[in-house]
């Protein structure tokens, strides 16, 4: 998980003042913010927040706000599976960018509740890995990356309405979508204008 200074906010009530880090304050409003590369640590935090919000209220919407360059496919799939089995509506918002694994999470929000901000971008591409080891190890890694690619294409097909064949063609190289293009492609539903 990348490290940066986390701002605090002061909440004033008749009972006094309380200081919160900004992410705790957002969580109180049922907002989960994914603003870094997705790795196992980030996935664990996001999943814990989603599970907490469902336990808090299983009938209130959860907002997943995304500004991420993507990251680990296995970490993304852990978040994806968590999103799919939760009962609340999961509204997704692309702020800045939802690239690679993060684009899958954007598309995986509840249909009709997937939003992109006006100047955001979404990027799809095929999964990649860096191989090392013996030829036998490399063959196993290649088979695994092909399995993950097929799995990711099936997930995107389910949520976008695109065929697996089209997704395979479109993700052979980086495919960048403007906010409007992401909606046309089925990655999102609504443009949030400024």
From Swiss-Prot:
Keywords assigned: Cytoplasm, Hydrolase, Protease, Serine protease
GO molecular function terms noted in the UniProt entry: ATP-dependent peptidase activity; ATPase binding; serine-type endopeptidase activity
UniProt-annotated location(s): Cytoplasm
A Gene Ontology BP annotation from the UniProt entry: protein quality control for misfolded or incompletely synthesized proteins
EC number of this enzyme: 3.4.21.92
GO cellular component: cytoplasm; endopeptidase Clp complex
Catalytic center residues: 100 (nucleophile), 125
Pfam family membership, one: CLP_protease
Highest rank taxon of the organism: Bacteria
Tagged with keyword Cytoplasm: yes
Main location: cytoplasm
Catalysed reaction equations from the record: Hydrolysis of proteins to small peptides in the presence of ATP and magnesium. alpha-casein is the usual test substrate. In the absence of ATP, only oligopeptides shorter than five residues are hydrolyzed (such as succinyl-Leu-Tyr-|-NHMec, and Leu-Tyr-Leu-|-Tyr-Trp, in which cleavage of the -Tyr-|-Leu- and -Tyr-|-Trp bonds also occurs)
Hydrolase listed as a keyword: yes
SUPFAM superfamilies, A to Z: ClpP/crotonase (SSF52096)
CDD domains: S14_ClpP_2 (cd07017)
Job of this protein: Cleaves peptides in various proteins in a process that requires ATP hydrolysis. Has a chymotrypsin-like activity. Plays a major role in the degradation of misfolded proteins.
Subunit structure: Fourteen ClpP subunits assemble into 2 heptameric rings which stack back to back to give a disk-like structure with a central cavity, resembling the structure of eukaryotic proteasomes.
PANTHER family xref list: ATP-DEPENDENT CLP PROTEASE PROTEOLYTIC SUBUNIT (PTHR10381), ATP-DEPENDENT CLP PROTEASE PROTEOLYTIC SUBUNIT-LIKE-RELATED (PTHR10381:SF26)
Similarity annotation: Belongs to the peptidase S14 family.
UniProt name for this protein: ATP-dependent Clp protease proteolytic subunit 4
Gene assigned in the entry: clpP4
């Amino acid at each position: 998980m990348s490290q940066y200074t986390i701002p605090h906010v002061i909440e004033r009530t008749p009972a006094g003042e309380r200081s919160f880090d900004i992410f705790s304050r957002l969580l109180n409003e049922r907002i989960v913010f994914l603003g870094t590369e997705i790795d196992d640590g980030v996935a664990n935090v996001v999943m814990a927040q989603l599970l907490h919000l469902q336990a808090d209220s299983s009938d209130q919407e959860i907002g997943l706000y995304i500004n991420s360059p993507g990251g680990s496919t296995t970490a993304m799939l852990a978040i994806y599976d968590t999103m799919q089995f939760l009962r609340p509506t999961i509204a997704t918002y692309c702020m800045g960018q939802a690239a690679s694994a993060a684009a899958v999470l954007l598309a995986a929000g509840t249909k009709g509740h997937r939003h992109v901000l006006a100047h955001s971008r979404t990027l799809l591409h095929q999964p990649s890995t860096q191989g090392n080891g013996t030829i036998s190890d490399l063959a196993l890694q290649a088979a695994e990356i092909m399995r993950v690619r097929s799995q990711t294409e099936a997930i995107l097909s389910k949520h976008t309405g695109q065929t697996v064949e089209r997704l395979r063609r479109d993700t052979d190289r980086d495919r960048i979508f403007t906010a409007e293009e992401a909606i046309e492609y089925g990655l999102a539903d609504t443009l949030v204008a400024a």
